Regions:
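Active-site Asp-x-Gly
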Residues: 216-269, 293, 299-302, 307
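Generic structural marker for isolated residues within well-ordered, non-membrane alpha-helices
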Residues: 35, 141, 258
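An alpha-helical support segment within catalytic cores of ATP-dependent transferases
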Residues: 27-36, 149-206, 217, 263
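A conserved alpha-helical element in kinase catalytic cores
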Residues: 32, 65-115, 119, 123-144, ...
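Conserved NTP-binding catalytic cores of kinases and kinase-like/nucleotidyltransferase enzymes
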Residues: 1-101, 217-221, 302, 306-312
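A glycine-centered beta->alpha junction motif in the catalytic cores
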Residues: 64, 76, 94-95, 110-130, ...
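Active-site acidic catalytic loop and adjacent metal/ATP-binding pocket
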Residues: 50-51, 55-63, 70-71, 104, ...
Length: 312
């Protein structure tokens, strides 16, 4: 692989659509110059991008001393996403297989840029049974959960309020692609989780624990990438696992997954279930907006099926 750096920058449709949805046209136009500046300042070679990136421009890179790395350039958007990710990596990152999150070599908050260790295959690429994936997701997420009161990260209550606003606005913008009952259920669950937030119990959570965000570590084990970063109840991360695999969720009793996750991690099943309800609608709408199908439609179909159902 040549990593001398692209004269032209290839951006996937998913990343391009997400950038356009965020109003980041100037960022897209400026990517070649941004990459050239980082190559010079960090003394790195930059190769082709990864095809499966969704939240940022992510490319293969190599340091001056030959170490394999990854260059990640965050899409500019409201909410300080780059600063939050950098904060999580500074708090929870490090060397060795016991670290649950990717190691960060360099960062530039102003440019939304990070130079990260290059990891192996994603959990999705390994083709493991869903039960094995859930065990690995839980075990990896647990290694991140810790007190981080002075991190400056948003709280679970703030995220719950943001999700409610996002659901309301995006549902209307897209012409109501799921039922009003599903949206009402998600908004009710979001309000419950906002009311339940407790600063004293809140821990650092990843915020997007799914099978594409867990990769094989170079020294064994698994590591998370792409943290959103919140100070929230740990159940939030398990709510993401509830959100994922929507087709498989409906093949049995959907409540069983929430109960298993709660028992596995010693947490509250109702909180896990409610975060899953909120995230399923929010993410289904987002994926529909950026054209990532069929999973967007599958999430919304699952949300319609589960509308009004509380954990019993």
């Amino acid at each position: 692989m040549s990593e001398s750096g692209p004269a032209q920058v290839s951006v996937s449709d998913v990343v391009r659509n997400k950038a356009l949805a965020a109003g980041a046209e100037r960022w897209l136009d400026g990517l070649p110059g941004l990459i050239a500046g980082l190559k010079r300042d960090w003394r790195i070679a930059v190769g082709p991008p990864f095809d499966d990136a969704t939240e940022a421009y992510v490319a293969r890179a190599r340091t001056e001393d030959g170490r394999a790395a990854v260059l990640k350039l965050m899409i500019p958007r409201p909410g300080d996403a780059a600063q939050h990710e950098i904060a999580v990596l500074r708090i929870a990152g490090g060397e060795g297989p016991d670290q649950g999150i990717v190691r960060m070599f360099r960062y530039d908050s102003d440019r939304g840029a990070m130079l990260l260790e290059r990891l192996g295959r994603s959990l999705d690429q390994l083709g493991l049974p869903i039960g094995s994936r859930h065990e690995i997701l839980c075990a990896t997420a647990e290694r991140i959960w810790r007190p981080a009161a002075r991190s400056g990260l948003p709280t679970g209550a703030e995220k719950g309020r943001w999700l409610a606003r996002h659901i309301t606005a995006t549902w209307a913008e897209l012409g109501r692609p799921c039922s009003a009952r599903a949206v009402e259920h998600a908004l009710t669950c979001a309000a419950r989780r906002v009311a339940a937030h407790d600063d004293a119990r809140a821990v650092l959570v990843h915020g997007d624990v799914h099978q594409w965000n867990v990769l094989e570590g170079r020294d064994g084990g698994y590591k998370l990438i792409d943290p959103d970063g919140l100070l929230a109840e740990a159940e939030y991360d398990l709510g993401i696992i509830m959100r994922e695999d929507p087709v498989e969720l409906l093949t049995g009793d959907p409540c069983d997954r929430a109960r298993w996750l709660a028992e596995r991690c010693g947490l509250d099943a109702t909180a896990i279930w409610e975060w899953g309800i909120v995230e399923r609608v929010s993410t289904g709408l987002l994926l529909t907006k950026i054209g990532l199908q069929p999973v967007g439609a599958q999430m919304l179909a699952a949300a319609d099926h589960l509308a009004g159902l509380d954990l019993t």
